[in-house]
Curated annotation (Swiss-Prot):
Keywords: Membrane, Transmembrane, Transmembrane helix. It is a multi-pass membrane protein. This is Putative uncharacterized membrane protein YOL099C. One of its GO terms (cellular component) is membrane.
Length: 163
């Protein structure tokens, strides 16, 4: 990613507080079903199904962050052509594509990767299917900056150590 140097620093420890500010206005795709947490939190609003609310606790944040960080690490280990990052109106959109074989590599390394046929909608969507690639669309701009900052730190460590 050639434009990582443009991203401003963001304190990772403030992420949870910032996320909670965005939750009331977060509107995922109506066709996406929330499968994370208590099923009772999968609600339809005004009969439109345009919003999905869930119980978001620190345990959920840790679990999701672990999966995300492992997948980002896997993206750095495999073919870099699978990684696309671009900027739209100041917001970062990252799409990472992985094939089924790439997932097996990650699992063999002990990464906490999701099982096949899992669909989650939290702060981002990711689709994992045995016959397609994984598609990640990160929705919150604060989340995008945090993720990219993690990559900046990771890449700078690699560069400093000539890895």
């Amino acid at each position: 990613m050639k434009t990582l140097d443009k991203i401003t620093n963001y304190d990772l420890f403030d992420f949870a507080d910032e996320f909670l500010k965005f939750v009331p206005v977060f509107r995922p795709n109506p066709t996406v079903t929330c499968l994370f947490g208590n099923p009772l939190t999968n609600l339809l609003v005004n009969g439109t199904g345009a919003a999905c609310f869930f119980e978001f606790c620190s345990l959920a944040l840790i679990k999701v962050s672990k999966i995300l960080l492992d997948l980002l690490l896997l993206a750095l280990l495999i073919d870099s052509e699978n990684e696309l990052c671009f900027e739209i109106d100041g917001d970062w959109l990252c799409v990472l594509g992985f094939g089924e074989g790439d997932l097996e590599v990650g699992r063999s390394l002990g990464m906490a990767l999701p099982d096949d046929d899992v669909l989650l909608s939290i702060t981002f969507w990711f689709l994992c299917n045995s016959s397609f690639s994984i598609l990640f669309v990160f929705e919150l701009r604060i989340f995008l900056r945090t993720v990219n900052n993690l990559l900046v730190v990771f890449l700078s460590v690699l560069k400093r150590n000539d890895l």
